Amino acid sequence: MRPIRRAFAIAVLCVAALLPVDSSAAGAGKASIETFVTRAIRPVMERYGVPGMAVGIIVKGQTYVYDYGVASTATGRPVTSSTLFEIGSVSKTFTATLAAYARTGGALSLSDMASEHLRSLRGSSFDEVSLLDLGTHMSGLPLQVPDNITNNAQLMEYLRSWKPEHAPGTYRTYSNLGIGLLGMIAASTMHGDFAALMQDRVFSGLGMQHTYFGVPETEWDNYAQGYTATNIPIRMVPGVLAPEAYGIKTTAGDMLRFIAANMGMLDINERLQHAIAGTHAGYDRIGSMTQDLIWEQYDDRVGLKELREGNSDRMLLQANPATRLDPAAPPRDHVLIDKTGSTNGFSTYVAFIPAKKTGIVILANKRYPNDARVTAAYAILTRLDDDASKD
């Protein structure tokens, strides 16, 4: 297993600095970093016909964004620092953050049973499903909300009769419903609307000024057109639990602020920082992957093979036996934490290593395989480490 060593890459193309940048170093490193990022990204765009991508990197306290291609093939509008992408299931990490925020305020405990907060589910299977199960894909709930469910009343009716195939807490089954219910419960315990609470407590708290559930009219021109794997133009259609599970649109720059906060690099509200750190505790073990509160965690010396397996279709679409950690593993710095996200027309990958203050986000306006995202990101992170050994 090849180690990912500490990255000391020379600062280049500074788009939004977290710390002061050395201009001479920036000039010296520009060709090297921009070249290897492009070499990792261009083949992916060509192979899968991706119209546009934005790649954000954090190295040594500096953030950089590289834009490629177009936001729309119809207009030829280029991807820029203002381009908004759908981030799919990476939205779940924000929902986990809001739930952790509610927890730090004493509004809920992860050991609570879901039916304690959703009265209509009392006497159902949710008497045995904890909030922790919902936030770690260990409830047994299916991946998608059934197509015939169009409102919360229908959702509750469906859930009242639902029965898990395995005992909660024993198998990992990736689920939009699980995190959706956790978000619903978190908002209820905070006596507010989910989207409004997220905007007020999380987005604003992190200084994410270009992150939305519903894209405002003033930003519509910045909203990238998405494309399916077969090149059909598409954007996300709102649905039940969509905001909680996959509904966020944002920029590469805003995502870098979120990654930076997850590595303790921003000066933010203490309660919010504590909540973010709480999402990095490890609760379940599946192969080489430790399941955090939505985030997925690996040793920071993880190899590409293990990282690809952890982000494979098997992990997404099948029930995988898991070992619950008791007690939970506390948050650690010497780990690689990641998450993929997709809608029908967009693809996202986020990975960061807290001990190295190094991270990456890849945003694309086309659906393409997780494997290609992980491989490209790993190549970039590894190259940063290779440069570190020469610094």
Question: Can you say where each PLM-predicted feature lies in the sequence?
Answer:
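Short, well-ordered beta-strand elements
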Residues: K339, S347-F352, K356-K366
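Short, surface-exposed loop or secondary-structure junction motifs
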Residues: V65-Y68, S72, S124-S342
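Bacterial N-terminal signal peptides
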Residues: A9-L18
